[in-house]
């Protein structure tokens, strides 16, 4: 399995698209959390879109990061949107019932924003 990698793209619509790859676990959660924290206070960002399509694995550290990111972004007047990941990743959200409380889309739109 691969360590967490991520690439952030800012769109003209005010979305920050973070494309994730590899494993979202304790070792990779810190740098991603710092990036989300930075985006929560950046002017012009209205939504943070986490693209989970290339994520291979996610543990409870990843779930915690997503839950805290949603809270932090909401407090800053921003929205968190998740692009659905592979079945194994989505299953973690289903089992914990977090899927009922988060915004998921199937893919980002053409500008990189959430559809």
Regions found by a protein language model. Name each.
Residues 1-56, 68-115:
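STAS-like cytosolic regulatory interaction modules
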Residues 59:
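Conserved G/P- and acidic residue-centered "switch" motifs that form tight phosphate/ATP-binding loops
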């Amino acid at each position: 399995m691969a360590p967490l990698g991520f690439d952030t793209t800012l769109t003209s619509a005010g979305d920050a698209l973070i494309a994730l790859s590899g494993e979202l676990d304790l070792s990779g959660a810190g740098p991603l959390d710092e990036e989300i924290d930075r985006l929560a206070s950046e002017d012009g960002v209205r939504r943070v879109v986490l693209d989970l399509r290339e994520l291979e694995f996610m543990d409870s550290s990843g779930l915690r990061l997503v839950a805290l990111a949603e809270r932090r972004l909401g407090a800053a007047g921003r929205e968190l949107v998740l692009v659905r990941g592979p079945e194994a990743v989505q299953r973690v959200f289903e089992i914990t019932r977090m899927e009922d409380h988060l915004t998921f889309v199937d893919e980002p739109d053409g500008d990189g924003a959430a559809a």
